Structures are given as structure tokens and as C-alpha cells.
């Protein structure tokens, strides 16, 4: 890296299910020039229409374990009872930062904690709902999850909301344009 290259800012985004992370991330991908959005690595098979390197990096369980063993993962989790693994590979994030690009990583609470402990200069953002009632309404209004799944997600949301003080920035998503602008400001150091 040359002396005049500035390290790109790393922003970690977390928040409960149905808070609007996907909507905000989609807008940021279109609105922020040169943004690198971290692509997760997974051991699951690609779904129809998914592209390796765009949707996920698809690897075998052994390749994933090798990445962990070599310190090449910023965070990871066993999912579906350990049948699959998913996580954030360090290489692409570090490369984008070294090239001066702002980097956005969307992860869960545990992932945010892990990455922040490894990269202390990371900016952490918790995307919060305007109220608990709004979050419940958004989650149940989707109509895509069973009552059991909704109950589990709401319990997880309570834990996540209780931890929001761990984040450097808490942004209330009561208006998408305002939330996107606030995250852009953090990404670009405004």
C-alpha cells in the first residue's frame, strides 16, 4: 500500500429481523460510490439463480474449516444445528480497505462483536426500530414465517435491542431515506 492510500472505513451493520437492513443495504449499494459490500462465505449449496462471489462464496465444509484454522475468517457461525456454516472472509474485506474503499458488513450481534474485537477501528451501527410495536408489526406483517419462527426472532430481537449500547452509532429506521443518509455519513466519514 502506498503512503498516500488511506485505509477504507469498515462499517459493521447489525439489527433485529424486520428492522429494514436489506432495504437500507440495497439503497446503500446503489447510492455509495465505490462501496464494497462484504459477501459471506457458506458451506450450503447455491440456490437457483445465485452466483458464486456475488451472493455468497460457496465452499466445502473442509475449505471453510481451513479458512478458520488459518485465521482467514472475521466471524463465522454454525447454522441449522451445525449442518452448515456461514461467515465473513477477511481477505476481500481487507483488500477493499487497503484500496481505500468503504466496506459495509451486515452481520448478526455475535458477528458484530467478533469483528469489532478484531478490528477496533471499525465503526459499528445498530439499526433499530422506532418502537418494539413497530418491529412486531413489521415481522408479523411479512406473512412469511410461522408463529414459532416469529417467536424465536422476537426473542432474539429482545437480546439484540438490549445490546444496542455496545454500538458506536444507533440509527432509528423510522424513515428509510433518513436512515440511509445517516449510514452513508458514517461510511464516508462525514
Swiss-Prot record:
Domain of life: Bacteria
Keyword line: ATP-binding, Cytoplasm, Kinase, Nucleotide-binding, Transferase
Pfam families per UniProt: Guanylate_kin
Positions with a binding annotation for ATP: 15-22
EC number assigned by the record: 2.7.4.8
Gene name for this UniProt entry: gmk
One annotated Gene Ontology cellular component of this protein: cytosol
Reactions this protein catalyses: GMP + ATP = GDP + ADP
Gene3D superfamilies: Guanylate Kinase phosphate binding domain, P-loop containing nucleotide triphosphate hydrolases
Compartment list: Cytoplasm
CDD domains: GMPK (cd00071)
Domain (Guanylate kinase-like): residue spans on this chain: 8-188
Stored InterPro entries: GK/Ca_channel_bsu, Guanylate_kin-like_dom, Guanylate_kinase, Guanylate_kinase_CS, P-loop_NTPase
SMART domains tied to this protein: GuKc
GO molecular function, one term: guanylate kinase activity
Protein family per UniProt: Belongs to the guanylate kinase family.
Protein name: Guanylate kinase
Free-text function comment from the UniProt entry: Essential for recycling GMP and indirectly, cGMP.
Amino acid at each position: 500500500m502506498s503512503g498516500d492510500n488511506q485505509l477504507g472505513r469498515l462499517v459493521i451493520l447489525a439489527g433485529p429481523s424486520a428492522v429494514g437492513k436489506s432495504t437500507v443495504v440495497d439503497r446503500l449499494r446503489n447510492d455509495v460510490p465505490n462501496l464494497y459490500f462484504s459477501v459471506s462465505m457458506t458451506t450450503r449449496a447455491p440456490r437457483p439463480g445465485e452466483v458464486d462471489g456475488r451472493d455468497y462464496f460457496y465452499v466445502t465444509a473442509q475449505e471453510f474449516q481451513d479458512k478458520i484454522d488459518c485465521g482467514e475468517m472475521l466471524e463465522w457461525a454454525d447454522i441449522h444445528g451445525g449442518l452448515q456454516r456461514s461467515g465473513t472472509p477477511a481477505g476481500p474485506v481487507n483488500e477493499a480497505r487497503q484500496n481505500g474503499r468503504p466496506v459495509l458488513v451486515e452481520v448478526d450481534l455475535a458477528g458484530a462483536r467478533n469483528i469489532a474485537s478484531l478490528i477496533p477501528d471499525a465503526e459499528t451501527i445498530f439499526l433499530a426500530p422506532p418502537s418494539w410495536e413497530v418491529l412486531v408489526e413489521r415481522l408479523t406483517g411479512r406473512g412469511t414465517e410461522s408463529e414459532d419462527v416469529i417467536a424465536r426472532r422476537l426473542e432474539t430481537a429482545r437480546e439484540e435491542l438490549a445490546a444496542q449500547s455496545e454500538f458506536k452509532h444507533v440509527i432509528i429506521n423510522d424513515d428509510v431515506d433518513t436512515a440511509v443518509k445517516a449510514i452513508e455519513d458514517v461510511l464516508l466519514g462525514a
